[in-house]
Structures are given as C-alpha cells and as structure tokens.
Regions:
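Sec-dependent bacterial lipoprotein signal peptides
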Residues: 1-20
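Acidic, polar-rich low-complexity tracts and alpha-helical solenoid repeat scaffolds
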Residues: 4, 19-267
Length: 267
C-alpha cells in the first residue's frame, strides 16, 4: 500500500512539472487516485486554483468512499484561500451537513458563518447576507459555547448587529424622507423597540413624533381624533428623552397644535 501511494505521488509530481497541457489531460483522466494525489500536492504548494478544479472533479467520484471527507474539506479550504467566500461558505456548510461527526465539523461551521461575514456588504446595501451570518454565528454559539472561536464570534456579532441597526434606521428614516408617514411611524416604532440603546435613539423618537402627527393631521375625519390622541401619548413618552433644543421646541409645537386640533374637534 505504501509503495502504491509512493508511485502515485511520483506520477502526480511528474504531471505537476510538465505544464498546462498535462494539467488538462489530468482533468480528463479517469485515474482518480492520481488526480487526488495531484490535487493535494497543488493545495500544499498553494496552487489553489488548480486544486479547486481537481477537487471539484473528484467530489462526485469519491462520494461515500475513502478520501471523501478529505476532498470536501480541502475543496472548501482551497476556495477559502482564493477568497471565494460565497462558494467556500457553501462548501463548509455542506461539509458540516455531510460529516456531522467529523472532528472538523466545528471549524467548518465557524468558517461557513465567517465566509458570510466576509461577504457582508456595507450597511447601505441589502443586508440579507448579514442576517444569514448573524443566524449562523448565533447557532454556532449555542452549539459550541466553549469554542476557542467565541471571542471572535461575539466580536463579529456585535459588528453585524450595529450594521443591521444602521440599516433599519436608514429604512425608517427613508420613509419619513419620502413623506410616507404611516410607514415611517411604524418602522420607527419597531426600531425603538428593537434597539433601545441605539445612538440615534433621540433622532428616531423625534421623527416618530413628527411622522405620527403628519399622519394623523392628514387622516380621514373618522380616524383623526384617535390618531391625534396617539400623538399626545407619544409626546408624553418621548419629551423627557429629547435633549436637542431644536427637537424639544418642535416637539412642543407639535403637541400644542395637536391639542388645539383636538379642542377644535370637541366644539
């Protein structure tokens, strides 16, 4: 067996040294043992692009056989080294599903989440990938709470939660900016419930009050009283938290106008 492996290694090395034409022949070859040895050698020599092509070629042939775990692992690792985080994350997640009892499963789960973290865009862009990364890291923390990766996991989670908070505020304020006051009101209310310690909390409270007032004042008559009363309640809840003098003055003005409108409706 050792002699056979030695011969395979020699053959793989010869193929590596004879250039591109022989690499194409290697890809088309049906000698999967030589392909496997060559893939590992390419990986160990940091020729990740060629290793990826060979591992991809080998995956189906070795499914359920000897070397299947090694191929799946190093395929994902080669993609990771090439910074193809989307495909690497997919392969690490697949590895964790296919080899749940492997000693590498914890690392695979971590790297699956980490790849999504690396692909997570700026908060101004769509945050679907960020949410997926958060979910995977939270699942990882539940399953391996004593992992050596936990300091990193907590740091990445904090960073991504800030990003999601900024995105949620941007969306809520965006509704206010385009004068969709009902949507702005609901979004800002949800934001304040979700992020009680947000640094932009004062801004959110102020725009909530303004949105609620503008939505109420433009409502149909049968709904106006109820919505104006809601504005009064919102004022009472937020006024003590407003520190910005401009916000306080405008909030007081909204309150006075709301009270005046309600008094007029009583007549």
């Amino acid at each position: 067996m050792k002699k056979a492996l030695f011969i395979l290694n020699i053959l793989a090395t010869c193929l590596l040294l004879t250039g591109c034409n022989n690499f194409e022949k290697l890809l088309k070859s049906n000698d999967y043992d030589v392909k496997y040895q060559a893939a590992m050698q390419y990986y160990n020599e940091n020729s990740f692009s060629k290793a990826i092509q060979l591992f991809e070629n080998l995956t189906l042939h070795y499914r359920g056989r000897e070397h299947a775990e090694e191929i799946a692992w190093y395929y994902a690792q080669a993609l990771y080294q090439e910074k193809d985080y989307y495909m690497a994350g997919y392969q690490f997640k697949r590895f964790a599903r296919q080899f749940p009892y492997s000693e590498r499963v914890e690392e695979a789960a971590f790297l699956s989440a980490y790849c999504k973290y690396m692909d997570s865009p700026a908060y101004t862009l769509d945050q679907s990938l960020t949410k997926e990364a958060v979910e995977e890291f939270e699942t990882f923390a539940e399953k391996w709470p004593r992992s050596t990766h936990m300091p990193e996991v907590n740091r990445y989670l904090d960073e991504m939660r800030v990003k999601l908070m900024k995105k949620d505020y941007e969306i809520a304020y965006g509704y206010y900016y385009i004068e969709e006051y009902h949507a702005a009101y609901e979004s800002l209310k949800n934001f304040l419930n979700l992020y009680p310690e947000a640094p932009m909390r004062e801004d959110a409270m102020f725009y909530l009050l303004v949105s609620g007032y503008k939505y109420a004042i433009n409502s149909r008559e049968e709904k106006k009283r109820e919505r104006l009363q809601q504005v009064v309640g919102d004022f009472d809840r937020v006024i003590g938290s407003l520190k910005n003098d401009k916000y306080v003055a405008e909030a007081q003005d909204i309150y006075n106008k709301t009270r005046a409108e309600l008094a007029k409706m009583e007549k």
